[in-house]
Amino acid sequence: MRRLFTSESVTEGHPDKIADQISDAILDAMLEQDPRSRVAVETLVTTGLVIIAGEVTTRAYVEIPDIARKTILEIGYTRAKYGFDGETCGVLTSIHSQSPDIALGVDKALEVKTGEEVADEFEALGAGDQGIMFGYATNETPEYMPLPITLAHKLAMRLAEVRKNGTLPFLRPDGKTQVTIEYEDDKPVRVDTVLISTQHDPDISQADLREAIIEHVINPVIPEQYRDDKMKILVNPTGRFVLGGPMADTGLTGRKIIVDTYGGWVPHGGGAFSGKDPTKVDRSAHYMARYVAKNVVAAGLADKFLIQLSYAIGVAKPVSIMIDTYGTAKVDEDKLLKVITELFDFRPGAIIKKLNLLRPIYRKTAAYGHFGRNEEEFTWEKLDMVDELKRAFNM
């Protein structure tokens, strides 16, 4: 059976991603001074204005407006003619402390309060909220990610690269990408459509822009094995994209959760990542779920693997754990679930410790996806549990 599947990504200059990066830059600054900071920071960006609000409990002191401006300038909004400029935009803040009712459940999990479990203070952290988290991996790409979102991210990263290194100096920071892949019997066989929408200077023609994007962005990214003469290419299909960024669209933290994860290939529990410290299971449990899924697939236990976790606020252990191999399991699935629960500790404190999450690593995650990347900061992408998983099945 043949079918088409599409995923999108956005550049770091997209308004929603500006907001994500500001929120995570603030989180990083606080974690750098106080690794136990409790942070939940939301950002709104619009024409000439940044609004930052949230709940923070920390010993750190950071200049939030300075962090916001620095982030905006690093993204590339450096000139007033772009309609948004890190030097001149206004920055408003409204930050207060974390609710003591929430802190009550996070600081000491229900299991500790009822005497069910004895643990040190850090291991006894309760989940910062209820929620549903999914982790996924597939062997269809070296990144163990679905091909559509992988290529969409690479195109978005390439757009930023050729803008910043001067290869295409007429590009501006805002941009979006979209890739449609044709699958046959659940295997990717070709790229059906590539869509690039990129902000640009007013004096570049549509024809010249299209030619430059094909030569310097699309051709270096799309693998030859997936190209054919039927591949459709769309570049700025409206014909013009001069007004962009926060001047054209308001941006908010947490509005690109599908871009951040698996491109719509699997379900999403709804919780966003950026601006949240790792006691928030919206973030840390998603990372742990990806870590489990990637190691399971890399160990050869399944070709595709999905795990769902759910939590209750103030309770350390997950309420439920579900797995799905889509019929690709090479081992007994009941045993696989049992092995996973024995090898991996899904309590928030244990996740934070295992993945070393109390570090200022989050700004980098806030653009081009949280998964499928091999930089040092992305500890949830490590394959250091493959051997243990194999041993559990005598492989």
Swiss-Prot record:
Binding-site residues, K(+): 42
Superkingdom of this protein's organism: Bacteria
A GO BP entry: S-adenosylmethionine biosynthetic process
Cofactor note: Binds 2 divalent ions per subunit. Binds 1 potassium ion per subunit.
Location in or out of the cell: Cytoplasm
Annotated Pfam families: S-AdoMet_synt_C, S-AdoMet_synt_M, S-AdoMet_synt_N
SS bond partners: none
Binding site for Mg(2+): 16
Top-tier EC class: transferase
Pathway: Amino-acid biosynthesis; S-adenosyl-L-methionine biosynthesis; S-adenosyl-L-methionine from L-methionine: step 1/1
Binding site for L-methionine: 55, 98, 249, 280
Residue ranges of the region described as Flexible loop: 98-108
Record's keyword terms, sorted: ATP-binding, Cytoplasm, Magnesium, Metal-binding, Nucleotide-binding, One-carbon metabolism, Potassium, Transferase
Binding site for ATP: 14, 174-176, 240-241, 249, 255-256, 272, 276
Main location: cytoplasm
PANTHER family listed in its UniProt record: S-ADENOSYLMETHIONINE SYNTHETASE
Subunit: Homotetramer; dimer of dimers.
Family statement: Belongs to the AdoMet synthase family.
The protein, known as: S-adenosylmethionine synthase
Natural source organism: Thermotoga maritima (strain ATCC 43589 / DSM 3109 / JCM 10099 / NBRC 100826 / MSB8)
